[in-house]
Amino acid sequence: MPRSTAILLTLTFIVGLLSLLVGAADVTFSSLLSGDAESLELLLISRLPRLLAILCTGAGMSIAGLIMQQLCANKFVSPTTGATISSAQFGILIALLFMPDSTIWSRAAFAFAAAIIGTWIFVWFILRMPMKDPVMVPLVGIMFGNVIGGITSFLAFRFDMTQALSTWLVGHFSLVLRGNYELVYLVVPLIAIAWIYAKWFNIVGMGRDFSKNLGVNYTFVLFSGLSIAAMITASIVTVVGSISYIGLIVPNLVAIFKGDDLRSTLADTAHFGALFVLCCDLIGRLIILPYELPIELIIGTLGSLIFIVLIFYRLRFGRRSLNKDLLMKLFGFEKKTPVCTSINGGTR
C-alpha cells in the first residue's frame, strides 16, 4: 500500500471515530463497551449511518469530479461546474411534481436520468465549441447550471414546491438515518467500475484522434464515463442534497502531488475526499454545538477559497505536478545556476 494511502486511511479512521462521538446526545466508548442500550441504538440508527453516508459522499463526489476532469481534459470541470448537480435537482423536482408520494428510489431514477442528460448536453456543447482558455469551460457550465437552476426554482415556485425542494438545495447529513440513506451505497460499485475502465478514460482524455489510433471508441467511452459520474452525483444529491466544490478541489489537490493518471490517483482521491468531507462535517457540528451548520456552508466557504487558489495555480503552472523546484518557484525562490570560477579568476 502506498504511503500516502496509508496516511489518509489512518487519518480517516481517527476522525471517523471522533465523528461517532460528536452530537447533541452524549455517546462515549465506555457506554458503548458497557452495552448501554440507548447509546447502541443511537450509534446504529444515526451516528454510524451518518458516518457511512459522509464517507460515500466524499469519495463519490471526488471520483465523479476526477472522471469528468479526465474525460474533458480540463481541471476545472466537475459536477458543480458541469451542471450535473443542477440537473439532478431538476430531476428530483419532476419526480415530486408527478409523484408527490414517490419513494427515494423513484426520485433517484428521475435524478439519474436528468443528471445524465444534463451532463451530456454540457459536454456536447463544449465539444462543439472548443475554447482556448480552460477557465471558460467551467464558466459556461456554471451559466448552464444556473439556467437549469432557474427553471427548477420557477417550477418549484409555480407549483408551490419550494419548501419540499429546499431539502435538496442545501446539502446536510442531519436527516441521514437507518433506512433512508442506503441509496448512497451505489457509489461503491460505480467507483469500482470507474477503476476498471480507468485506462480507457485516460486514453479518451488524450483526445479523439489519439483514441481512434488506439482503437478506442471515443464517443462511447466518453459518454459512458460521464454517465458514471452523473449517477454517482445523482445518488448523493438524492440522499444528502447539493454539496459543491468537492469534485472540483479534491482531484486537483491530489493531482498536484500525484499526477494525472486516473488509476494511480483514484484511491487517494477517494480517501482524501472522504477525509475532507468528514472534517468539514465535524467542524459544522462543533461550531454551535449542540446545533449544527449545514455541510454545504462549510464546504462552500472553504471550497470557494481553494478554487480561487487553484485557478491561479493552474493558470501559472498548467497541469504540472508539485515538486521541490516548483515549490521554490511558487513561493518566489528561483533556482539559481551556480557560477564556476576558473583558476585565472574568470567565470565560466
Regions found by a protein language model. Name each.
Residues 1-348:
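Alpha-helical transmembrane segments in inner-membrane proteins
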